[in-house]
Amino acid sequence: MNAHPKEIWEQCLNIIKGETTEVSFNTWIKSITPISIENDTFMLTVPNDLTKGILSNKYTDLIIRSLQMVTSQKYNVKFLISSELPEEFLTLDTINEQNIKGSIIVSDEMSAMLNPKYTFTSFVIGNSNRFAHAASLAVAESPAKAYNPLFIYGGVGLGKTHLMHAIGHHILHNNTSCKVVYVSSEKFTNELINSIKDDKNVEFRSKYRNIDVLLIDDIQFIAGKERTQEEFFHTFNALYEANKQIILSSDRPPKEIPTLEDRLRSRFEWGLIADIQPPDFETRMAILKKKADVEKLNIPNEVMAYIATKIKSNIRELEGALIRIVAFSSLTNKEISVDLAIEALKDIISSGQSKQVTIELIQDVVSNYYNLKVSDFKSSRRTRNVAFPRQIAMYLCRKLTDMSLPKIGEEFGGRDHTTVIHAYEKISNNLKKDESLKNAVNDLTKRLDQQ
C-alpha cells in the first residue's frame, strides 16, 4: 500500500478505537505519532517511558493487527520516546518506505521554556478541571480560532501551569515552526525593567510581539505596576489584532484582580474564562495513582485513600505527600501502610485538626474500601457488590453522624428514610453473627477516626 505513515495510522486508529475503551484510547493510543516506515518496521513516537511501557505490553499486538488490516502487510512496530529521537528522525520524513529529506525546525529556546512533564497526556481530568482542560485543548488544536484570549484561573497548585505548558507543547508538536513564548508575569516585568535600563525597548517589543502564541502565568502580579500594564496593553493589542493566540493564568478572575486597569480587565474578558476548582476525592485518587504509575511506586490503595482524604486543595501537596511517604518508608525500612503514612505526614497534617465525620467522608472511605465510586451509592444499582457496601455506609452515617434519616437517604440518591432504617437494622443484626463484617466495620470506623 503506497501511503504516508500518517495516512495509514489514521485508518488504524478507526480500527483500534473499536477495540479499546474510550479512556484507554484517549490516554494511550492518541498519544502516538507515526514518523516513518523503515523496511518492515512501523516507527511510532510516544511522549514518555510510562506510555512506551504500557503500549509495548498491552497494545503491540492490536497495533500490528490493525496495520495488517489496513496495508495487507505484516509490520513490526517500534516505539520511540519523542524527546529521545535519533537525529535522523528530526530531519527525515519517510514516505512509501523511501527517505525524503524534510526540514523540521524545532526551537530549543521555545522548548526549554516548557516543562516536559506538563502535557495533556499527564494531566488528570476530573469534574473540577474538565472545562478548563477542554478549553485548553481547543485552543491548542486551533490557536487564535477557538477562544482568544483564554483566561484560566484557580487556586495555587491546582494545575493552571500544567495546562499552560501542555498548550505550548501541543502547539509545537502540531507546528514546529510556530513561535511560542511562555513567561511568568514577574519575568515579563523584569525583562521590561532591564530593557528600559539598557535602552533595549525595541528588542523587548520584538520578542513579545513577533510571535504566534503568548502564554503568561500569574498575570495578576502585573496589577499595580503602571509601566508593566501599559506595555502589556500594547503587546496584547498587537498580538490580538494580528490574530495571534494569548493565554493567561491567574489565581482569580479578571473582575477580582485589584488595581488592574479597566482596559486590561475588559480585554481579559473578551475571550473565554475557565476556572479550576479543588479536585474531588475521585480525582485526587486518580492523581495519586497516576503519580505512582509514573514514578513506578507500589502504593497500597488504602494509603492513597488516606492521603486523598487528608489533602484536598493542592495537587502539589498531594503528590508531595506521596513522595514523602515513600521516602519515609525507605529511610525507616518499613513497609508502606496507613499507619506509616500517618507517622510520615504527622508534621504536615495536624492531629488536632481532625475533622468531623460527615456523610461525604463516610461515602468516600467506604466506596474506596470496596473499590467503588461514590456515584455507585447514589445510583439505582442493586447488585450485591454495590447494595451491601451502600447499606454499610448508611449504617455508619446513622451511627457516626447527627444527620436525620431523611437527610441520609437524600445523600444516597434521594432514597426514602425507610431504606436507611432497613440498612441500619440489617447491618446491626448481621454484625452479631458475621465476623468478617464486624472486622470490615471496625476497620472502616478506625479509618474514619483517623481522618
Swiss-Prot record:
It holds the Pfam family DnaA_N. ATP binds at residues 157, 159-161. Domain I is involved in oligomerization and binding regulators, domain II is flexibile and of varying length in different bacteria, domain III forms the AAA+ region, while domain IV binds dsDNA. Residues 73-112 are annotated as: Domain II. It comes from the Bacteria. The keyword DNA-binding applies. Plays an essential role in the initiation and regulation of chromosomal replication. ATP-DnaA binds to the origin of replication (oriC) to initiate formation of the DNA replication initiation complex once per cell cycle. Binds the DnaA box (a 9 base pair repeat at the origin) and separates the double-stranded (ds)DNA. Forms a right-handed helical filament on oriC DNA; dsDNA binds to the exterior of the filament while single-stranded (ss)DNA is stabiized in the filament's interior. It is found in: Cytoplasm. Residues 113-329 are annotated as: Domain III, AAA+ region. This is Chromosomal replication initiator protein DnaA. InterPro entries: AAA+_ATPase, Chromosome_initiator_DnaA, Chromosome_initiator_DnaA-like, Chromosome_initiator_DnaA_CS, DnaA_C, DnaA_dom, DnaA_N_dom, DnaA_N_sf. Oligomerizes as a right-handed, spiral filament on DNA at oriC. It comes from Clostridium kluyveri (strain ATCC 8527 / DSM 555 / NBRC 12016 / NCIMB 10680 / K1).
